[in-house]
Design a protein with these regions (language model features):
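Short beta-strand-centered segments at strand-helix junctions
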Residues: 34-82, 88-135, 140-167, 171-175, ...
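Protein-protein interaction and targeting regions used for scaffolding, dimerization, and localization
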Residues: 1-31
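Short coil-to-beta-strand transition motifs
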Residues: 179-181
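Electrostatic, structured charged patches in enzyme active sites and in nucleic-acid/phosphate-binding
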Residues: 221
Length: 221
């Protein structure tokens, strides 16, 4: 069995398990997308990681995440904004990247006293400043904090099925007692990804999302 076929089977099995775990109340399976809820987290470069944890420090994996090759590390930091009200225990996700980024919610931003933009991950031109504190030192990053846009990870095959392209915006619906329609959900396409929608904890709490579930794809904006 070739590697490409194995990858496809693994992708389909994981998506099916996520769909089963999420139930199916009021949704049509053909339009169902597994949902992941993103808590605040950090992406770092190797250089910044070593400033915070020490020269030559090992970047250690704790557990795998849903998307292939991505993982939660064993390492956490404290983040501090102008209000000097720190948020501790913010986990670093791997692998290490070529830019430093802190993804937070609006609730976090109010606590920290900053006004980060709502943008796609990696868009840092207007990002807000924060100080990161680790066991070996601290680093001030003038442009690092964002609120990540609602988005869906898709393969090109998924995109064709839903009739969307990279960079399109769409609508998704969450069922349940606090059924919610989310608009301005960004489409991101990469054939190495598994199909999954991402909301942050503010959005998830507003819709009373308590566990793994799935959303219904409604259509393009």
């Amino acid at each position: 069995m070739n590697e490409e076929l194995v990858d496809r089977i693994v992708r389909e099995v994981r998506e099916a398990l996520a769909l089963k775990a999420g139930g199916g109340e009021g949704l049509h399976n053909g339009n169902a997308i597994p949902l992941g809820v993103s808590n605040r987290h950090i992406h770092l470069t190797r250089g910044t990681f070593e400033k915070l944890f020490g020269a030559g420090a090992a970047f250690e994996e704790m557990r795998s995440l849903y998307q292939p090759g991505e993982f939660a590390s064993k390492h956490t930091l404290t983040i501090i904004g102008p209000k000097q009200r720190p948020i501790s225990g913010v986990r670093i996700l791997g692998p290490l990247r070529n830019y430093d980024q802190v993804e937070i919610t609006l609730t976090d931003a109010i606590t920290l006293g900053i006004n980060p933009p709502v943008v796609n991950s990696g868009t840092l031109d207007d990002a807000a400043p924060l100080t990161l504190v680790g066991p070996a030192g601290s680093v001030y990053l003038p442009k690092c904090a964002i609120i990540a846009s609602r988005h869906i990870h898709m393969t090109s095959g998924d995109a064709a099925r839903f009739g969307v392209q990279e960079g399109d915006y769409c609508k998704i619906r969450v069922g349940g007692i606090k059924s919610t329609l989310f608009e301005n959900v960004l489409v991101r396409i990469n054939d190495n990804w598994l199909l999954q929608a991402h909301l942050d904890t503010d959005d998830a709490n507003a819709a009373n999302i308590r566990s793994e579930t799935h959303v219904e794809f409604i259509g393009k904006m």
